């Protein structure tokens, strides 16, 4: 399975390329004036510490000096790993010159929307095939 999704907001839009590699998943997220790789998050599913019947995930994050995408890759990799019960690697590179605090808040909202788009595509594939492939 491989696909690309993008948010369609007024501004601060994000795109993601999602690819299944065996049982694992690779997600690249980019947006802004200078898309790049600023951080990488690697997450693995595990039973929740609060409720072993629920799935959770633990992530390790690597971030280049001066980059702030660590928050994005941690959130997305953990959420997808728990949802898919799989190992997930997420890269992100987002850059807008002189972004305001309001702009950062809008980017965070777009990350949530991007996650919903990713999960909807995976759900559609599961429904169509009876399983994720």
Where do the PLM segments sit?
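Short amphipathic
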Residues: 1-7
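Conserved mixed alpha/beta catalytic, RNA-binding, or beta-rich assembly cores of soluble enzyme
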Residues: 7-83, 87-96, 103-111, 117-125, ...
């Amino acid at each position: 399975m491989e696909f690309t999704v993008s948010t369609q907001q007024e501004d601060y839009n994000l795109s993601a390329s999602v690819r299944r590699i065996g049982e694992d998943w690779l997600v690249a997220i980019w947006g802004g004036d200078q898309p790049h790789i600023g951080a990488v998050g690697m997450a693995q599913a595990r039973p929740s510490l609060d409720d072993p019947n629920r799935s959770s995930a633990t992530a390790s994050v690597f971030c280049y000096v001066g980059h702030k995408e660590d928050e994005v890759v941690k959130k997305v990799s953990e959420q997808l790993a728990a949802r898919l019960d799989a190992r997930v690697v997420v890269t992100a590179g987002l850059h807008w010159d002189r972004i305001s605090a309001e702009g950062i808040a809008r980017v965070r909202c777009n990350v949530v929307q991007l996650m919903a788009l990713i999960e909807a595509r995976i759900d559609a594939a599961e429904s169509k095939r009876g399983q994720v492939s």
